[in-house]
């Protein structure tokens, strides 16, 4: 059963400006260590960061917490599986909050066009 649904829209240009201004510090504040490995291999860093930001926002909206209430931006992450599908990761703190709320695993779908990234996330109830 569905626990919650979240969406987010991000302008890639906005994330590009933050990346240009703050550089590695921005990357370290936004990405989990596992995500930084994938980031280092990207040719379009602003697009990658915008997709991660939108996906994280959508997941915390699906949790019903937003950023705060024990879940911060580095408590949620994503790694692409063998087919390129983003798999949701939680830090131990993020997983503890999701468990306390009764949320199980999550799904996210991402797309980008015309300088925008759109993320839709679904959190499932814990079985």
Label each PLM-derived region with a short phrase:
Residues 1-127:
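Core catalytic alpha/beta fold that binds nucleotide/phospho-ligands
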